[in-house]
């Protein structure tokens, strides 16, 4: 899995929740940071992306000081609900520090 050396744990997403092979779609030109809409550990997020039929994933997940990786950077994670953006982006899901209605994210 190609990615950051800052990762503390790697958990491969289910193959049906991302697209294998980014090179035919162009280079990485953006980073997307998205919140989980929940208070989740990197293991919780990894299990979510391993769920058959989830149809979603991220390259990385951050919870506290832990960084998880779920999809290789040479593959396309399904994070943005926008195909062209997904093709260009490395995506990072962050755990929330609280819930609705404000969904805060801690530093």
What are the language-model segments listed below?
Residues 1-107:
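Active-site-adjacent loop/helix surface patches within enzyme catalytic domains
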């Amino acid at each position: 899995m190609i990615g950051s050396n800052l990762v503390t744990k790697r958990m491969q997403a289910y193959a049906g929740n991302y697209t294998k092979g980014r090179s035919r779609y162009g280079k990485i030109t953006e980073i997307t940071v998205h919140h989980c809409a929940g208070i989740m550990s990197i293991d919780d997020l990894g299990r979510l992306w391993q769920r058959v039929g989830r149809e979603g994933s991220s390259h990385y997940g951050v919870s506290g000081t832990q960084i998880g990786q779920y999809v290789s950077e040479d593959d396309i994670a399904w994070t943005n609900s926008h195909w062209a953006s997904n093709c260009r982006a490395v995506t990072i899901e962050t755990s929330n520090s609280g819930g609705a209605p404000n969904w805060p994210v801690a530093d």
